[in-house]
A protein has these predicted regions:
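A conserved acidic beta->alpha catalytic loop
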Residues: 28, 40-52, 63, 87
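Catalytic-site signature of metal-activated, phosphate-bearing donor transferases
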Residues: 8, 68-76, 92-221, 225, ...
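Acidic helix N-cap motif at the loop->helix transition within catalytic regions
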Residues: 20-23, 45-54, 95
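N-proximal low-complexity "stem/linker" segments adjacent to membrane-targeting elements
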Residues: 1-28
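Short beta-strand/loop segment that forms part of the nucleotide-sugar
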Residues: 13, 34-42, 59, 88
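Short aromatic/hydrophobic "clamp" motif used to bind/position activated sugar donors
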Residues: 83
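Conserved donor nucleotide-binding strand/loop of the catalytic core
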Residues: 34, 48-73, 77
Length: 347
């Protein structure tokens, strides 16, 4: 399939009560597409009016309890040769000019890089802040591709998936937005689980939902079961492992987390995120086992964060957090060295 002036490229959104962010999203993508298609599922704020003011073709539908159904209805309405799928709390940071160029050639699915920002403190002993997590998500679809799944829906297609040099920002994980969405997806996830009880991706998403509500013990159960059946080549296995290790630590199971990290180390030799979390786990152990802190745990923390700096940033890794291969690791090392120095002087 080639793309030319007669080929339509549409930005396709499903929305509900997104007045806070809809204009920003549509204004960022408008210059790069032929059509803005918005399907509203029951907004009670000014979302519809703002979308129309931004030039969108707005349609309305009742919410039927499935994100896949809504996505597919929006794709039917768009009727475009290529579809860029966006959420209202996202906006293009860079690469908009690459969209149309990428669509030249044979049909395939495009994965774009989504930078999700957080306010949350990742409550490890190092008080780790997660400012930006990177995810490569399939969002650019040729005509005919449709979604499956009530929640955390996925496009289903035998076509190959390739990365597009398109970068989105996403602020839907900021605390103020998460509080509004608390528990919104849980019921849908549980329904999906009854139909697909062994699906590792559903288990992973349930764990993330529980982690977001600080239910760390429950999250560990779902992460553990997800990890058992997640293939080594699954692109989201990296993020799954990091979330699982973090929740084990928060559940007071740092020793168990370190054993798991040891078993998984060969799979992620070049992940700064993996070694950053290992450093945090070692610091947790130093606090819970002070007798061996100087001899064992603090040196392990230091060498782990040094490894992060040696690897550098890896934005190509699913679930990678910006800074773990640079300033966040350096900060932890600086704090550790200053505190260790004080401890040695006092001895």
């Amino acid at each position: 399939m080639s793309i030319n002036k007669a080929t339509q490229l549409a930005a396709v959104l499903i929305v509900r009560d997104e007045a806070r962010s809809i204009s920003r999203c549509l204004q960022s993508v408008g210059p790069w597409v032929d059509r803005l298609l918005v399907l509203d599922t029951g907004s009670t704020d000014t979302t519809v009016e703002l979308a129309r003011a931004a030039g969108a073709d707005v349609h309305k539908t009742a919410w039927l309890g499935s994100f896949a159904l809504a996505r597919n209805q929006a794709l039917d309405l768009a009727n475009a040769d290529w579809n860029l799928i966006l959420d209202a709390d996202e906006w293009i940071e860079s690469g908009g000019e690459q969209i149309r160029l990428w669509c030249v050639g044979s049909p395939r699915l495009g994965k774009v890089c989504v930078h999700s920002s957080y306010d949350r403190v990742g409550a490890s002993a190092a008080n780790e802040i997660m400012p930006t997590e990177l995810s490569w998500i399939t969002r650019l679809l040729p005509r005919g591709v449709r979604y499956e799944g009530r929640v955390h829906e996925q496009p289903v297609s035998p076509l190959p998936r390739e990365r597009v040099p398109l970068y989105l920002n996403h602020d839907g994980y900021r605390d103020a937005q998460l509080n509004k969405k608390q528990g919104r997806n849980r019921e849908l996830l549980l329904l999906e689980l009854t139909e697909r009880p062994s699906d590792p991706y559903i288990l992973y998403q349930l764990g993330k939902d529980e982690e977001g509500r600080s239910e760390f013990a429950a999250a560990c159960v779902h992460y553990q079961n997800a990890l058992k059946t997640t293939g080594r080549n699954a692109n989201w296995r990296h993020g799954l492992l990091l979330h699982y290790l973090h929740c084990l630590s928060r559940a007071g199971r740092s020793g168990e987390a370190l054993k798991l990290a040891g078993a998984e180390m060969e799979a992620f030799p070049d992940s700064p995120d993996f070694y950053f979390v290992v450093g945090n786990l070692a610091l947790d152990q130093a606090i819970s086992d002070p007798e061996h802190a100087i001899s064992d745990w603090l040196p392990l923390a230091a060498v782990s964060w040094e490894r992060c700096l040696a690897i550098g940033e890896r934005p190509d890794l699913e679930g990678s957090v910006h800074g773990r291969g640079s300033h966040l690791a350096q900060h932890n090392l600086d704090v550790l060295r200053s505190q260790t120095g004080l401890a040695l002087v006092r001895k």
